[in-house]
Amino acid sequence: MQEHAEAAMIEHLASTLQPAFDREKSGRANAPFSNSITSQERDKIIDRSVRQSGRYFTMRAAGVPEEEIIASFDKPTEMQVFAYERSGDSYITTLRDTVMTPRDSIIYAKTFLRSGFMAMDSETGEVRAYVGGPDFLTFKYDMVTQGRRQVGSTIKPYLYSMAMNEGFTPCDQLLHVQPALRNPDGSIWTPRNAGSSMIGEMVSIGWGLKHSDNWVTAWLMGQLSSDGYSNSFVNYLHSMGVTSTIEPTLALCLGSCDISVEEMVGAFTTFSQKGMRQEPLYVTKIVDKYGNVVANFTSKVHEVLPEDAAYKTLYMMREVMNGGTGSRMRFRYGIDADMGGKTGTTQNHSDGWFMCFTPKLSTCLLYTSPSPRDS
């Protein structure tokens, strides 16, 4: 499974996502960054990366003056850079010989999408596949545990499961209009919606998750929050194994917080395991050189939800895959297995998430554009 996961990540990046990202950024003055930042901000990001590079620290340790170090980054130099290469019917990663300035090589490296993938056995917690990126030798940044990104709509199943635990059902109806929620400071928050269907009509809570509807989600947030605070939802996320710092804002229901792939995978086991959350297990046993077992390890299990609340959430997440935002997975790859899932995008599609689970496997995939947070 590990080999398949690594190959699939490289294949999808090299053949589909990276070319699309390159076309999107082509001709933009601030490429590979968003045009929402100024050229001065872009230069600051690059300058910071220069001072965090191995070349900079090596020259500084050798006693080279600061001015000379910085000047060296603008001199064309022979080097090897990361690239995708076609090999038969698939793609591989390689190092390509070239000549460019070290500063340009930093910008070049930031044009490549980052990614992280993890799969674990939902029943035992054993990690089956772990891919921290397309090539760790080049991008020494683990997007499974180190990299945290805004989770967007993949946070919604947590809110909906919390609602199920509070007595709501997938069949409960509400008027599909834009909600207006009051923040603690008295200001009004009115979330936008990506779609325009069913406006002014009665819809179900299950319909809201199936179509990743922001208005239904925000309405639920209002029902579960008090005085504009979402402390109860924050506490619930922590009970699901999320250790990241989370601000208790109303917009949290739409995924404004940063969470890691590892945290997401562990939390999603709750829905397929009748409300019991499994912690990821990386090592099952230790043996000495003679083959004697020194220690055995098992995953820690936490009861998060009553079984009926977990089942109601599971039902809604199945619908996401059967006819909602995740249904393309079935049509494109011809998968008819029983599964649930959730998609999520954030920050003008700079981050893309896909959560999916079967009765025995929980997975999370993240694709993300280069970010100043990685610099």
Question: Can you annotate each of these PLM segments?
Answer:
Residues 168-231, 277, 289-314, 318-319:
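Conserved catalytic neighborhood of penicillin-recognizing serine enzymes
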Residues 188-193, 225-266, 275, 279-282:
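Mid-domain, small-residue-enriched loop/turn segments at the edges of structured enzyme/sensor domains
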